[in-house]
């Protein structure tokens, strides 16, 4: 059975996703997840039967509602990473890129209403994944989102510039900045840093795994030996962080980190977690920025070794990734002696792609030959006859070597006879006096 649901599609940062009102989706989490899996077409590498796009950057969903339980916030936001070949929905991490579209969606759907004279709108967001707060500032004109704020030749359509302030980013998943209690650990012969700020990330130096940091994602994704080793490290890191078996989770993430160029602080290849990101996650960049100022972390060691490293007072880092550069500004805590970051500031852009109606199926209502289709106006036994006519005359066994079409040709006359009989019964059920079928052939 098909169920319609309205959605808005945005390109948000370097991701694309579908945005839904929470009230439009099933309330029970398992039913909600089943609906999202159906909408995105998960289970096929191209998600050809849905909206996912066959890529982790586009198989994303934002679920938004008015924040009725928390008066200090405008909206609640739940991020869902939907599997591609695997049929799953992971709500453990936040997604900063997709969050950049939440303010636009909240305004478009009437959850937030700017004054007609406002030129910017502040939207206060409570993230249900990390249980943390963020603020988004978006340009508006006459009470609507101003998508013409950016007109960049590198963008396919006009976009709105969004400022994101991540508040209290420490311990997004584990409640601790250093989940293992250490700034660095050794796993599988590698020195790593496991940091939880905005999202849990395992940092590994690029040269320790034999890469330069200039490799294309496709090159790294083809390196099965590297991917296998990174997954071993990630699984052990998850155990040490207290997350248990993370083989079925998208956290912790992995970042292969190295020194940047003359104009950037770092180069990074970010894994999501079993494939290299085509760009870089915003939350991962925030974690990188925080890790850069944690004494003893591998990220801090890289920063400290560079003559052009930014000063602690600037608290701004830039990360070169496969698609460009991502900058993060940091607001240090009131107690400067602490190696913590209270607020991280990032700028993204958001482009409106479509307001649309999509459809999802209810799994237990899918038709099969074991449960024939019936309707009030047509006798059920008529459908049973018609279904029987189209079933294979001979069911191939495991030892059959003939192709299915050869079996169909060999039993052509039997199949025609069955269809003819079914047609007789169908017409007769509606009171017709004759239902001869003649000159039929199978092509």
From Swiss-Prot:
Q: What happens when the gene is disrupted?
A: Abolishes the production of itaconic acid.
What GO cellular component entries does it have? cytosol; nucleus
State what protein this is by name. Answer: Aconitate-delta-isomerase 1
A Pfam family per the record: PrpF
Q: Which organism is it from?
A: Mycosarcoma maydis (Corn smut fungus)
Q: In which pathway does it act?
A: Secondary metabolite biosynthesis
Gene3D superfamilies, A to Z: Diaminopimelate Epimerase, Chain A, domain 1
* InterPro entries in the cross-refs: PrpF-like (IPR007400)
